From Swiss-Prot:
It is found in: Cytoplasm. Belongs to the DTD family. The gene is dtd. GO terms for molecular function: D-tyrosyl-tRNA(Tyr) deacylase activity; Gly-tRNA(Ala) deacylase activity; Ser(Gly)-tRNA(Ala) hydrolase activity; tRNA binding. Homodimer. PANTHER family: D-AMINOACYL-TRNA DEACYLASE 1, D-TYROSYL-TRNA TYR DEACYLASE. A Gly-cisPro motif from one monomer fits into the active site of the other monomer to allow specific chiral rejection of L-amino acids. It comes from Mycolicibacterium vanbaalenii (strain DSM 7251 / JCM 13017 / BCRC 16820 / KCTC 9966 / NRRL B-24157 / PYR-1). Keywords: Cytoplasm, Hydrolase, RNA-binding, tRNA-binding. This is D-aminoacyl-tRNA deacylase. An aminoacyl-tRNA editing enzyme that deacylates mischarged D-aminoacyl-tRNAs. Also deacylates mischarged glycyl-tRNA(Ala), protecting cells against glycine mischarging by AlaRS. Acts via tRNA-based rather than protein-based catalysis; rejects L-amino acids rather than detecting D-amino acids in the active site. By recycling D-aminoacyl-tRNA to D-amino acids and free tRNA molecules, this enzyme counteracts the toxicity associated with the formation of D-aminoacyl-tRNA entities in vivo and helps enforce protein L-homochirality. Its main location: cytoplasm.
C-alpha cells in the first residue's frame, strides 16, 4: 500500500461537478492519495492508517491525531504505475478494483476509528481534486 500525503490548507474532490469530499479552509489537514497493490490486506490498511494518523508533518511537529486535523482520502491506482520501459506507464502492480476498493474503504474506516474526521472521494470515478498545498509538504508512505 502506498499513500501520498500532502499537507493542505484546503482540498476538495468533485465528481461530475458535485463536491463529494472536502477539507474546508482552516489551519491544516491532510490529503491522502491511496494506492493498493496485490498483496495488501486489511491488516496493512490498519497499520497505514495508524502511521498516517501519527505522522508528525503538521506545524510544530504535530500529527493529525494530536490536533484532530481532517483527512481527505482519495483512491489513486496510478501510484503503482511503472515507467521503466517505453513512454507509456503500465499498471500491473496496481490491484484490481475488486481488491482495491474494500482496502481503501478499510483504510478510511480505520482512520475514523482512530478519531479522524475523514471524507473520501468516489472509488473508480473520474474525480477532480483541488488543493492548496501547505508548505509544500508531500510525503510518500509505503508498507
Amino acid at each position: 500500500m502506498r499513500v501520498l500525503v500532502q499537507r493542505v490548507a484546503s482540498a476538495r474532490v468533485t465528481v461530475a461537478g458535485e463536491t463529494v469530499g472536502e477539507i474546508r479552509p482552516q489551519s491544516q489537514g491532510l490529503l491522502a492519495l491511496v494506492g493498493v497493490t496485490h498483496d495488501d490486506d486489511d491488516a496493512k490498511a490498519q497499520r497505514m492508517a495508524e502511521k498516517l494518523w501519527q505522522l508528525r508533518i503538521l506545524d510544530d511537529e504535530k500529527s493529525a491525531g494530536d490536533i484532530g486535523a481532517p483527512i481527505l482520502v482519495v483512491s489513486q491506482f496510478t501510484l503503482y504505475g511503472n515507467t521503466a520501459k517505453g513512454r507509456r506507464p503500465t499498471w500491473n502492480a496496481a490491484a484490481p478494483g475488486a481488491v482495491a476498493e474494500p482496502l481503501v474503504d478499510a483504510f478510511a474506516a480505520a482512520l475514523g476509528r482512530l478519531g479522524a474526521d475523514v471524507q473520501t472521494g468516489v472509488f473508480g470515478a473520474d474525480m477532480r481534486v483541488e488543493l492548496v498545498n501547505d508548505g509544500p509538504v508531500t510525503v510518500l508512505l509505503e508498507l
